[in-house]
Amino acid sequence: MTPFLNETHDLFLKSWVESANAPDCDFPIQNLPFGVFQRRESEEPARIGIAIGDRILDLTCCIKLRLFDHLPESLKNACTATRLNSLMALGSESASLLRSTVSQLLRIDSGQSPPEANILVAMTDAELLLPAEIGDYTDFYASIFHATNVGKLFRPDNPLLPNYKYVPIAYHGRASSIVPGGIPICRPQGQRKPPDAAVPEFALSRMLDYELEVGCFVGAGNSIGQPISIDRAEDHIFGLCLVNDWSARDLQAWEYQPLGPFLAKNFATTLSPWIVTLEALAPFRDAAFQRSNDDPQPLPYLFSKSNQESGGFAITLEVWLRTEQMRAEGMAAVRLSQGSFSQMYWTIAQM
């Protein structure tokens, strides 16, 4: 699938939601990420929303006010669900139609004066929830730099295993411990074996670590035994989010052989509550990672000319630290790391 720009990406678009037009706004009208929220101190069920400025567009309210009457019934029904699963399952064409509709509704030149108080909820008045019911998830080892650095911790003489450059390496994670951002994480406990100890001990982890990752929500699925070709893979992708893959390195070092990590990884995974659609990311598409001349080329089923040309994403990712004590003392956050998602060895379509 080749990403295309359309009118929703126009840099000159402005919204009648004033906060969305601020230069440093995370949610301008060109973004329009999807999420699920619940009004604070309300017994109403969760609702699907779209972030715009410092507000959330309530899709259920839009349906009730007949602002989306031209949309297909299946899409309107999906907009009133309490999770994004039904909407994502409709596929990329439906997601694109909804994005276009919302973009037109929120434009300052739309010619409409919708009842703002009824369709918008202040971010401060909402609790952000997990955007979808996640029955399963796969954790890929897509950065060759990360794989090499972590490999050095456990295999200094052989950090990168020979299969890495041939097949996207992954393992299944624990879906039941996925939480949205803002939920406190408990320090895990398990077996750890200090280098100078003869036997392991059971204790709290002393090497709790973070991993900055990008999550990918799969929408429309496929039948068992029917593979999805690399050229059609992105038709099944709804959008991306941020992920913190919490890791207990001391537990991991002891337990990971021979089948890989388990308790060191399954205690918590944090997701950002907003999903940015692939269509919204079209202006940031990039070529796939350029392998060195010594590296093998992908096997035919993992190779596509269009994927090589635009399978990457030119997204800069950062990790900032601001502890409770730093906040109490009015200290500024400290940046721990910065990297580019375009440096992933494997593209999303290949994975």
Predicted segments with their positions:
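Extended C-terminal subregions enriched in glycine
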Residues: 340-351
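Active-site microenvironments in enzyme catalytic cores
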Residues: 8-42, 51, 57-334
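Charged, compositionally biased non-catalytic regions
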Residues: 1-7
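Short, surface-exposed charged micro-motifs
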Residues: 48
